[in-house]
Amino acid sequence: MKVFAGFILGIVVIIGGITAYVFSGIYNVSAMVPHWSITFNILEEARDQSISYHSKGIVAPSLKDPKMEDAGFHHFQDTCRLCHGAPGIASSEFAQGLYPKPPDLASPDLHREMNNSKIFWIIKNGLKMTGMPSFGVTHSDQDIWDIVAFIDRLSALQPDQYKAIVKEANQRDEQHNESEEKAGHGHGTHHQHGGLPGSS
């Protein structure tokens, strides 16, 4: 009986201590202060297990399609590059203050750890308290698979190759916009899927 009472008392003390700590405001939520190692490891493991569990059953389509890669490149430029950077291009200034730091999507290590189904799930659903939004709110599944198709190719690109893709895409955009203006439409779009350089 004394053992049981001691156990209950211990639980009450632990709960009371946690409650007091939470409401004290002592814990520093600043993004400039990293998590304790044990906290980081627990959160990282919970994240990885959650992604693995919830991405089960997602079957990736064939991603070796130049049109998918081209569409994915434009989405990547619009929505991913600022936080994640690109080959030879650093992330934007504001992204460097994010915690945890957004991963380098061109890293071979990331592609060894994450299959395309997991990457699709992350892009679609986002990750709580990381700065990673859910693009499933604003993008179709096809749009997201297009992004995955480009990310799948990203690790093989050298900085000069990425710059060449950006340059060619900008030239196509300008040509298309000029054609639209001459035709009297007065508006253009940059999502013209002619295929990326070297993607065939």
Indicate residue ranges for each PLM-predicted region:
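Periplasmic c-type cytochrome electron-transfer domains
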Residues: K2-D70, F94, M114-N116, F135-F150, ...
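Sequence/structural segment immediately N-terminal to covalent heme-attachment motifs in c-type
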Residues: P66-I89, W121, N177-K182
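A general structural signal marking secondary-structure boundaries and capping sites
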Residues: P87, L127, S155-Q158
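Sparse recognition of residues in long alpha-helices and their boundaries
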Residues: G88, F135, K163-A164
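Histidine- and aromatic-enriched segments that form or immediately flank copper-ligand environments
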Residues: I89-A95
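Extracytoplasmic electron-transfer domains, predominantly the class I c-type cytochrome c fold
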Residues: G97-R153
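Short, flexible loop/turn segments with low-complexity composition
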Residues: P159-N170
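Short, solvent-exposed mixed-charge patches
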Residues: P197-S200
